[in-house]
Amino acid sequence: MSSRKQGSQPRGQQSAEEENFKKPTRSNMQRSKMRGASSGKKTAGPQQKNLEPALPGRWGGRSAENPPSGSVRKTRKNKQKTPGNEDGGSTSEAPQPPRKKRARADPTVESEEAFKNRMEVKVKIPEELKPWLVEDWDLVTRQKQLFQLPAKKNVDAILEEYANCKKSQGNVDNKEYAVNEVVAGIKEYFNVMLGTQLLYKFERPQYAEILLAHPDAPMSQVYGAPHLLRLFVRIGAMLAYTPLDEKSLALLLGYLHDFLKYLAKNSASLFTASDYKVASAEYHRKAL
């Protein structure tokens, strides 16, 4: 004890800093234990918050605003460890090589485990509409007929009639808001996916002609019920990549299935083979 005091008096402020660095070692150990215990508790908060049964705008999901609990935990650990280095610890007490070997996790990159565990979203097509999907395929791919465009009743008109039908049933305000969001989301997905995922190969020259004739028009104002129905065969795979939590996704699927029931109920007026016409010989040459 005497040798420590004699060496500390000439240093002045440095002796005080060394003593302050040595004193909190026990408290630092307690803090690390508390940190390990608290990290498990704090993860439950965001998960419960994301499970609120509310349909997000444009199906975006509240979880998009909050990073996954794993990334939050890693960020907190990094933030708590950095002050320890700034307080003046020597390299012998806090070895650097292990820290250099630890790679920082990028919160924007999905882990392999999360990708494998991603839920599969299945949209159930009503039995009444399945025969029409088969007939639509047969008319285009085997009989080489084309759905006449612009459609007599386009996708926008179908969605608007559905929304008006639901609102006329006396729904409360929050359900009316949800219907508006569902309709807007269906329209948005349709316009994005049509050119890449909703067309048969034989229809692509027709699509190119439509783009030239209507360069500024959204495809939901040009195409009709058959292509809208094709959307629901593909949309499940797309919904698996949205940041929606499980309850919000289940709520959304309920609205989508309700819309499909509406299509099935009105299938006689929405789906008819008379809307198709045999393609010309010139078109066949373009489609080769």
UniProtKB/Swiss-Prot annotation:
Gene Ontology terms: cellular component: NuA4 histone acetyltransferase complex; nucleus
Superkingdom per UniProt: Eukaryota
Polar residues bias: start-end ranges: 1-15
Transmembrane parts of this sequence: none
Name of one Pfam family that matches: MRG
Modification sites for Phosphoserine: S71
Keywords for this protein: Chromatin regulator, DNA damage, DNA repair, Growth regulation, Nucleus, Phosphoprotein, Transcription, Transcription regulation
Annotated ranges, domain MRG: 117-288
Main location as per UniProt: nucleus
Annotated Gene3D superfamilies: MRG domain
Disulfide bonds: none
BP GO terms, sorted: chromatin organization; DNA repair; regulation of DNA-templated transcription
Region (Disordered): 1-113
Record localization: Nucleus
UniProt function note: Component of the NuA4 histone acetyltransferase complex which is involved in transcriptional activation of select genes principally by acetylation of nucleosomal histone H4 and H2A. This modification may both alter nucleosome - DNA interactions and promote interaction of the modified histones with other proteins which positively regulate transcription. This complex may be required for the activation of transcriptional programs associated with oncogene and proto-oncogene mediated growth induction, tumor suppressor mediated growth arrest and replicative senescence, apoptosis, and DNA repair.
Quaternary state and interactors: Component of the NuA4 histone acetyltransferase complex which contains the catalytic subunit KAT5/TIP60 and the subunits EP400, TRRAP/PAF400, BRD8/SMAP, EPC1, DMAP1/DNMAP1, RUVBL1/TIP49, RUVBL2, ING3, actin, ACTL6A/BAF53A, MORF4L1/MRG15, MORF4L2/MRGX, MRGBP, YEATS4/GAS41 and VPS72/YL1. The NuA4 complex interacts with MYC and the adenovirus E1A protein. MORF4L1 may also participate in the formation of NuA4 related complexes which lack the KAT5/TIP60 catalytic subunit, but which include the SWI/SNF related protein SRCAP.
The protein's name in its UniProt record: Mortality factor 4-like protein 2
Record gene name: MORF4L2
